[in-house]
Amino acid sequence: MERVTIIGIIFAILVVGWILATGQWAYGNVVGPLVNHSKIPLLKITYVSAYENAKGTYLILNITDCCGPDAYPASAPIMEIYNSTWHVFLYSYNISNDTVKVIQAPWNENKKDYTNWYSGFVVILGSEAQFQLQLPFHLSPGTYHIKLYTPAVSSKVLAKQTATFTIS
């Protein structure tokens, strides 16, 4: 073999060794489990209120995205409203059609929260918005729970995306 080829092979082995060594040192993923430290979106309902009107139930939700990546917003394409005897699922197209107003928080300067037919509620990391929905059905008096379903989250996270309200 030529001298240049031998030096190239030795250099390549050293580079691969350096990459594997720093990967093991920093992340422990050469020998051991592969670790993914990416954040999972977490939507929180900070306020909920509802009242009956002639058209059905008027629902007011303050939703914030308090954890997750800032490269793309968190979404909740499914919302469940339930109590001990009854439940309904609102899918993204229902959420989009029933939303009559979105009030942005004052600190939402550049990116705005919104709804659409595909993603349902769309909330930017660190922002908060009030979503006002006119539901086309009446809720009987009682205590209800709302749960927002975010794609790819565990049941522990879903438990945190729940709020309670009362219709009197």
UniProtKB/Swiss-Prot annotation:
GO terms for cellular component: membrane; oxidoreductase complex; plasma membrane. The keyword Oxidoreductase applies. The chain crosses the membrane at residues 6-26. InterPro entries: DoxA, TQO_small_subunit. It comes from the Archaea. Inhibited by sulfite, metabisulfite and dithonite. It catalyses: 6-decylubiquinone + 2 thiosulfate = 6-decylubiquinol + tetrathionate. Increasing activity in the range between 20 and 92 degrees Celsius. Its EC number is 1.8.5.2. GO terms for molecular function: quinone binding; thiosulfate dehydrogenase (quinone) activity. Optimum pH is around 5, pH range of activity is different in tested buffers. Keywords: Cell membrane, Electron transport, Glycoprotein, Membrane, Oxidoreductase, Quinone, Respiratory chain, Transmembrane, Transmembrane helix, Transport. TQO plays a role in sulfur oxidation and is proposed to couple sulfur oxidation to dioxygen reduction; caldariellaquinone or sulfolobus quinone seem to serve to transfer electrons to the electron transport chain terminal oxidase formed by DoxBCE. This is Thiosulfate dehydrogenase [quinone] small subunit. It comes from Acidianus ambivalens. The gene is doxA.
